[in-house]
Amino acid sequence: MSGSGRKDFDVKHILRLRWKLFSHPSPASSSPAGGSCLQQDSGGGSFEHWGPSQSRLLKNQEKGSVSAFWKKPSSSSSSSSSSSSSASSSPFNPLNGTLLPVATRLQQGAPGQGTQQPARTLFYVESLEEEVVTGMDFSGPEDKGLALKELQAEPASSIQATGEGCGHRLTSTNHSLTPQSDLDSSSSEEFYQAVHHAEQSFRKMENYLKQQQLCDVILIVGNRKIPAHRLVLSSVSDYFAAMFTSDVCEAKQEEIKMEGIDPNALWDLVQFAYTGCLELKEDTIENLLAAACLLQLPQVVEVCCHFLMKLLHPSNCLGIRAFADAQGCIELMKVAHSYTMENIMEVIRNQEFLLLPAEELHKLLASDDVNVPDEETIFHALMMWVKYDMQRRCSDLSMLLAFIRLPLLPPQILADLENHALFKNDLECQKLILEAMKYHLLPERRTLMQSPRTKPRKSTVGTLYAVGGMDNNKGATTIEKYDLRTNLWIQAGMMNGRRLQFGVAVIDDKLFVIGGRDGLKTLNTVECYNPKTKTWTVLPPMSTHRHGLGVTVLEGPIYAVGGHDGWSYLNTVERWDPQSQQWTYVASMSIARSTVGVAALNGKLYSVGGRDGSSCLSSMEYYDPHTNKWSMCAPMCKRRGGVGVATCDGFLYAVGGHDAPASNHCSRLLDYVERYDPKTDTWTMVAPLSMPRDAVGVCLLGDRLYAVGGYDGQTYLNTMESYDPQTNEWTQMASLNIGRAGACVVVIKQP
């Protein structure tokens, strides 16, 4: 290697070395300090040849590792510059009976100095698989990009080293001396891996491209010709790889015409194939993504999709969603669709919405996930779209109107539609309007009129709130809310203090927290929580302290039913008038009840189950506010305390709870669910819960019942399940953030 002053071995040089070593031996006594002959050690052992044996190299190649290579010291015109080696200083001295399998060289000081440089070894770092001799000092002179190191040998058993600039490691083990005859068959071998080889190679190919050298294909798109190298294009594009390696005509053509691709986008992607660099711009990103999809460049497709995700806005999300669908970019389409659903109120105010084709609009109208406050909003959006181009779009009106939940519109809107000019002469539209009017006029038949148009959209059903309850910390003070669209629970606020066995009602989208106990005493206090402002207001207290009471709203006022005052079970009932903000007593129940379930149905207040001090109850009675009287109903099939009660489609449901007979104080937790039909005054067993739940919170959200939390005998539950009356099945839903038993669950339409 000329850069280091050494000369590479050739065949003549090897023969000359053999001649010096074996054909013309010189006496040890005649060799001066600068003699040119190597001598054997005093032990009489033979030298190992310089460098690893051929068999060792082959063995290492089979293992996938590479041994070090060696170079002979440079020779001058006077071969006497080489130094003789003694047994004590020779680098070939055995280490525990073995020698390093690396080439060594003796470096002699300046003539006449008599000093000897330490033995050093040149090696190339390649394998990461084996152990090598340790205790060596490394230095790393660079030689025109070669990843070489110089190694100073010291006695040791193993070594690990990392080659400078390439991240590889030479590994080796100690080896015994090999026969001298190996020198005759061995050859000089080198193993090398360039640093940044691929980068440098592609940079050179880029230069060839710029100079239009060695180009073997020309891509023609429009009026533009783009030269390139087939190998480079095939290495990054599966499209070109298939083209150039298949038996198609393009595989042999020097000029290939590209159809359906933007010229600038193709140019950018060809440059990307050579450089790995790409500039993304808002005005060209769609052409670039379309070209990348065609040419099958997955890396480019991914970065373009992420770039478009960042550009999503109510004014362009519909276009991006349609474009992603056309290109088969599934992830981008999902993100754009979710963005559209979430921001639909802003989307319908933009030009893109008005320009939607009818096929795309019906997908929006049919979705349960559009984030609208009510069905009326969707209806007005449809009317706005139709009026934008009335002559062409009237023919699509009946098809699109079928995706509007007309039965859920206010009756006054339906009355106006019947004589509207757009619908008056359309028979299909008239049928849809009549169906919706029947739904309002015949509420008792609604269970027979169920259809996709009677199912409310997720965002219109309101938000489910879970307030307080017993947890592992002896009383939860957090308020969580559940969003049906996202199927997630999040914390919505905090209570003013700890309350257990209290009641909650909703008036004007505000939570009224009533009674309960704080762990020491039974409460009669009342507080009002505003979810919008997250503020609490103290209201006048009840006349009676109550925990384990039932609370509900009936025709405006709030009713607080039964409970326990700390001394006895109660049958008294109080009513809160929102106008006068006063509590007054109404008629008392027939039976004292605590841990009672209450619900309003068909203008009556139902009081279900509970405990009377001796056992759990199966009885139920109802209160008529117009007569101020309580009347008994048919009893439940099961006795239940801590029962959850809610109404759905004209039926009353009793869910979970516990049964503790008077003769046995051990409670039996229940997973039974019963349904009461007020028309026939009968109870019917329906599908049970997935697990027993005592002190379970139950309410109606949309068209389903939700059972939240509870106690299973060992754990305060954070699970929730929903009941579909149409299929008579319970389904697991998202879990609360903490387990709660006795939590009050209510729905607020507009949180």
Swiss-Prot record:
Q: Name the PROSITE patterns for this protein.
A: BTB
Q: Which UniProt keywords apply?
A: Actin-binding, Cytoplasm, Cytoskeleton, Kelch repeat, Repeat
Q: Spell out the InterPro entries in the cross-references.
A: BACK, BTB/POZ_dom, Kelch-typ_b-propeller, Kelch_1, SKP1/BTB/POZ_sf
The principal localisation class reads: cytoplasm
Q: Which Pfam families match?
A: BACK, BTB, Kelch_1
Map the Kelch repeats onto residue numbers.
463-509, 510-556, 558-603, 604-650, 652-703, 704-750
Compositional bias annotation for Polar residues: 170-184
Gene3D superfamilies recorded: 1.25.40.420, Kelch-type beta propeller, Potassium Channel Kv1.1, Chain A
Q: Which CDD domains match?
A: BACK_KLHL1, BTB_POZ_KLHL1
The record's account of tissue expression is: Highly expressed in brain.
Q: Compositional bias of type Low complexity: which residue ranges?
A: 25-36, 74-90
Provide a GO CC annotation, any one: cytoskeleton
What is this protein's function? May play a role in organizing the actin cytoskeleton of the brain cells.
Q: What is this protein called?
A: Kelch-like protein 1
Q: Which organism is it from?
A: Mus musculus
